[in-house]
Structure formats: C-alpha cells, structure tokens
C-alpha cells in the first residue's frame, strides 16, 4: 500500500474514533497509533467475519483456527442473545426501525470519489474478499441491510436507500454475484442461506455502531429477539464449553510454518 493511501486510511480511522495517535518520542516528535476502546470492541465483528468466511467462502488458503483459552479448545463460536442466553440467527429476530433511524436510509457522504471498478475486491492479498464486497462499499451494506429488513422489490430498494437506480442495480447485481441475494422469477430479491448466514456480522455492526456512534436513547435500528421478546444484545458463546467469549480469552493460532512470513 502506498504511503499516501495508508496515511489517508489511518486519518479516517482516527476521525472515526477507532485509532488514537500517541506520542512515543519527542526528539524528533513521533507518534504511534493505538486502538481506542471503540476500536478494541471491533473484535466481535472480526470474529463474525472470520466465522462467515470459514462457513461460506471457498478459499485458496486456510484461515487460522480460533482458540478459547479458558477451555483450551478450538471453537466455532455461536451467536447468542445476551438477555436469555439462547442461540440466535436471522430467523429468530424481528428488525424494527428505532426513533433514531428511518427506512429511508442514506449512506454518509464520501469525501473522496471512488469508482465502482476501484471498489471491486480483486486483490488476491485481501484476507476476506467476499466480506469486503459487502462491507467495503457503503451502498452494498445498505442494500443488504434493507433486504434483511424485508425489502424485496427494486423500486423499494431505490426508495428506502435514497440511491439512484444505477447504484441500486449495480449493488443488487454484486450481491447476487456474491451469492447472498437471489432474484426470483417475479423480479423480487430475497436473501439466500449464505446471505442469512451473514446475520451475525450485520447484528454486531449495528450493535457496535449504536454503542459507539449512536445517539443516547435513540437507536436507529432495533433487533428484537423473538425467543425472549427483548432487544438483542449479541454475545459470542464457545461451542465447546458454552461460556461467553471475552476479547482477552480468545486468540487465533497461526500455522507455525507461516509465522514470520
């Protein structure tokens, strides 16, 4: 990555509250980047991305296993409701637009224009290319969220997203190509099993955004767990011992042959 591009990305992450610059040398003055509390809390989303790619994406390489240090076993974590403890998936929740949100979603403005071609996840060095195809583009994430909320028809995607027909058509095509949406005979778009499997990522992104960027007491989107009729507070549970996972008690185990590469 060119230094100029890296500098822009680091600045954006600082502005978003994910990184903070900390001086570590005074002569000459130098700074290092450290994760904030909001940045550290992204670990739950990263595990969701890892788990989805492990389950649904054919890869030329093998992702490292996740180990739960408390039980010492490799885990395939399970998303659960923090209120009742039950396992939860896309079919177990009802999305509701909160007082701080609207179905007429609009993506935040971009300060630097980037073409659709430039945003294609074609770089073989990308660790999670299909996830980047969904989350790496602002409109793709909006369209997939709307599909999860029950939007089916093209005109409804266009109206709810507040995007141009060209943008909506392009993102629907990309999401269909990735395999998270399918287009039926009647022209409606529905989520595939692969798309429904992306629910933990969406749920944790919503939870993180409300926790660190939302207005106090005014959620933009609420996820109601039908099992307990409460608002979903997603947590990860170890599928081996059942305990709730904590950031400092899990780690990825790299292949010894790949260390230092």
Predicted feature residues:
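Short beta-strand "wing" residues that participate in macromolecule-binding interfaces
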Residues: 21, 183
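Basic, amphipathic "hinge/linker" alpha-helix immediately C-terminal to the N-terminal HTH DNA-binding motif
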Residues: 25-46, 187-204
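Glycine-centered, phosphate/nucleic-acid-interacting loop/turn motifs that mediate DNA/RNA or nucleotide
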Residues: 17-18, 179
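N-terminal helix-turn-helix DNA-binding core of bacterial DNA-binding proteins
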Residues: 1-2, 126-163
């Amino acid at each position: 990555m060119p230094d100029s591009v890296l500098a822009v990305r680091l600045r954006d992450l600082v502005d978003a509250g994910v990184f903070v610059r900390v001086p570590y040398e005074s002569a000459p003055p130098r700074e290092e980047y450290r994760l904030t509390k909001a940045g550290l809390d992204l670990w739950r989303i990263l595990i969701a991305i890892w788990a989805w790619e492990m389950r649904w994406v054919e890869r030329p390489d093998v992702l490292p296993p996740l180990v739960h240090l408390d039980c010492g076993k490799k885990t395939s974590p399970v998303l659960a409701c923090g209120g009742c403890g039950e396992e939860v998936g896309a079919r177990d929740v009802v999305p509701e637009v909160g007082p701080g949100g609207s179905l007429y979603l609009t993506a935040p403005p971009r300060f630097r224009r980037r073409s659709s071609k430039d945003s294609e996840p074609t770089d073989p060095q990308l660790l999670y290319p299909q996830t980047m195809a969904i989350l790496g583009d602002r409109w793709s994430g909006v369209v997939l969220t709307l599909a999860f909320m029950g939007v089916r028809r093209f005109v409804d995607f266009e109206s709810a997203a507040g995007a141009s027909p060209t943008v909506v058509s392009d993102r629907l095509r990309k999401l269909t190509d990735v395999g998270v949406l399918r287009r039926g005979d009647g022209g409606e778009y529905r989520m595939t099993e692969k798309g429904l499997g992306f629910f933990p990522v969406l749920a944790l992104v919503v939870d993180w955004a409300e926790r660190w960027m939302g207005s106090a007491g005014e959620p933009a989107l609420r996820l109601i767990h039908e099992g307990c009729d409460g608002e979903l507070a997603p947590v990860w549970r170890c599928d081996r011992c059942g305990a709730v996972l904590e950031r400092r008690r899990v780690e990825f185990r790299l292949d010894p042959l790949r260390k230092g590469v």
